[in-house]
Amino acid sequence: MADSPNANTRLPAPRRNVIAVLIAVAVIAGGVIGWQNIKRHIFPRHWEVVDQGMVYRSGELSSTLVKSTWEKHNIKTVVNLIGKDEQDDPAHEAAATAATELGINRAFFPLIGDVTGAVESYVGAVKAIVESKSQNNPVVVHCAAGTYRTGGVVAAYRTLVEGWTGKAAYEEMISEGVKPGPATPLVVYLNAHIGEIAQRLVEEGVIEKVPDPLPVFGP
């Protein structure tokens, strides 16, 4: 009696187990990725308070949440750190529309994704935050994910405007998702350029003097 087709094509048990595991992993991974995409439309991306009721930080908000979130927090100024090459998407278009409808001022100070870039972008961003706050206008600063570029600007604001230590600002960066360690590009950049940023803020009338000693970012 000939073997059935199923008997000839049936995979060995070990191989079947491996395939089953791979399928399960793929399903789980797909579920995680899917949830991350769904979550962006339910919760404002990386929305956090810097100064209660006045200064906020975030990632780029989804087109479904940007207007309602800005309106809820009475945002009057948006400090955008995203580069021009990252701004051609529906979320950016929705943000532009929301800003127009809500009468929000948008200020652009682009930084590269690895947080390096022009010192002037840091200076301009910190100055915009301080000016908006001084006029009692709530402000949000954001990049794409709300972690590195936003973390760098907030760290400069914390240390040079609010008087935080470099260590305290570093710990906040880590708590917000920045990779720990003195060799992290953001930490290296801040330690190399914080003096120049401070000097330019003095020249712009944002702070009275360059801190002495300068803040050192690290554990």
Label every PLM stretch briefly:
Residues 2-139, 152-219:
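Cys-dependent protein tyrosine phosphatase-like superfamily
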Residues 143:
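Short cysteine clusters
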Residues 146:
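Substrate/cofactor-recognition hotspot
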